[in-house]
A protein has these predicted regions:
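Ribokinase/PfkB-type carbohydrate-kinase core domain
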Residues: 1-168, 190-201
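Glycine/serine-rich anion-binding loops at beta->alpha junctions
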Residues: 171-181
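Short amphipathic alpha-helical face segments that pack within enzyme cores
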Residues: 180-184, 201-204
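Hydrophobic transmembrane alpha-helices
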Residues: 183-191
Length: 205
């Protein structure tokens, strides 16, 4: 129902929901849910699910993202099919042409994030600057992510989260890492919305 989506912190979808056979109701129901989310300014979150779904028609997905999606979650294989770029950082950067925030897992190499912040509010990192296809890409990694449309002077910001090395010396399996990262992000979105509702004048928003 529309009122459920209207009161939600986010609408989370998988790519499978819109790539079904002609005439099946799942796609129409998903698109209706997206329209409700857009109507009530609820962020739409999409997980790409598998590279094979994306490889079938990458341009269709690019158009779908630009029209409907706020936050994109993917792994490096899905990112390659979507953008044609094998580097997860530059693939995430390209995806910012279509969405406001990107999470891209890179197997045992950790997680990349890319998003927008207001130029005037950028926050310098206290960590060492990292090399990459975008030089010193983590310079403003402490900045608060914003929707691009809410920025007067949008600035792209990036970060990298390395794997936690308190466990095994060699990471053998990263299944579920992206789901865990997305869960943390969704928790932050929900907590921020709850705090904004209950303490509307807080400087933390």
């Amino acid at each position: 129902p529309e009122e459920v989506i209207a009161g939600a912190s986010a609408l989370v979808l998988s790519s499978y929901l819109v790539r079904c056979k002609e005439g099946e109701p799942m796609k129409a129901a998903t698109l209706q849910a997206i329209e409700y989310a857009k109507k009530h300014d609820v962020p739409v979150v999409l997980t790409l699910g598998t590279k094979y779904v994306i490889a079938d028609n990458p341009q269709w997905w690019r158009d779908f993202l630009k029209e409907n999606v706020t936050i994109l979650a993917m792994n490096e294989d899905e990112a390659l099919e979507l953008t044609g770029l094998s580097d997860p950082l530059t693939a995430s950067d390209m995806a910012l042409e279509w969405v406001d925030l990107v999470l891209c897992t890179a197997g045992p190499n950790g997680l990349y994030m890319a998003g927008y912040t207001e130029e005037a509010n950028k926050r310098q990192t206290q960590h060492p600057l990292l090399p990459g296809h975008i030089a010193e890409f983590n310079r403003y990694e402490f900045s608060r992510a914003m929707r691009r449309e809410h920025c007067e002077n949008p600035l792209r910001v990036y970060s990298h989260i390395a794997p936690y090395m308190g466990g095994p010396e060699k990471i053998m399996n990263t299944n579920g890492a992206g789901d865990g990262a997305l869960s943390a992000l969704l928790h932050d979105i929900a907590a921020n919305g709850y705090h904004r509702h209950n303490v509307p004048n807080s400087s933390k928003h």
